[in-house]
Amino acid sequence: LEESEAAERVAAQRRALAAEADALFRDPADPFKGNPRGDVTLVEFFDVRCGYCRAFHPTVAELLRRDRGVRVVLKDIPILGPNSVLAARALLAAQRQNRYEALYDALLR
């Protein structure tokens, strides 16, 4: 019974992912790094104040250096308080000025 319930949960998750694939992977408003036509797309959910996100940042940078076929879609989720919201707003302003990547990299160092 547990196994069939787990299989149904996995199937439901796959259906939900398929239903939202465009919003996750192909939203033209989302900033991204890497190859715009990459054959592999990674979606990174982050908060610039998150220590785990900061620790993971060099790994993503290294992946992009090594594999020119990767596109990383960036989803800023400001969940760690008012300073996270302020940083998210700054990133939006930077995106409008074509400076998102530079600010993103600076905030996650």
Name each region found by the language model.
Residues 1-85:
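Extracytoplasmic thiol/disulfide redox context detector
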Residues 1-7, 78-109:
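Cysteine-centric redox/oxidoreductase cores and disulfide-bonded domains
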